[in-house]
Amino acid sequence: MFVSFLVGMVVGMVVGMATRAHTDGVRLAGQAGQVRREIGNDWWIRLVCRLSHGHWRVHRERPVVRDLGSPWQDTVASERTGWRTRAAWLHGEHVFAVDYRVCRRCRIGWVESPATFEPYRRCGLATAGLIALRADHPGLTWHTLGGHFPVSQPFWESVGSGVPGGYAQGALCPHVDRG
């Protein structure tokens, strides 16, 4: 009897935490248009790469991910030189992030590696983040670099519906470095 009481309490706590995470995630998705941008785009790294015709790369240490005090943040990407990261923060931790790159000359945008922390999946964070990116960069055709995992195919079909390019796999243009 005591064991079933404990199990009931634990299950109740887990369900309560999941419900709170979902509610918080939905609320955060609704704030996707409130973005704080970190200044800095590694212009000097791109200059060195351009002057050396891509033969010499500057390797930098992985930047520290820091909270800028806004629910949604746009910062220099930590793993791809010249790319940026759009991330959602909740309770001092990032719960969603996607790397992106834009070529204004070719009117193309790429997104890579969207990731949502488990308790906040299916709250609309990824969809809201991608919509906000498109709003910040209107008139672009949107692609991804890599193929899509079979399990993520429904997600890409959903978020790509009606979007120019549809987040289909697309190579980088000559003006953009893979990072």
Task: Provide a role label for each language-model segment.
Residues 1-121, 131-143, 147-179:
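Non-catalytic substrate-recognition and accessory regions of acyl/acetyltransferase enzymes
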Residues 127:
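Residues forming the Rossmann-fold NAD(P)(H) cofactor-binding site
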Residues 124:
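Conserved G/P- and acidic residue-centered "switch" motifs that form tight phosphate/ATP-binding loops
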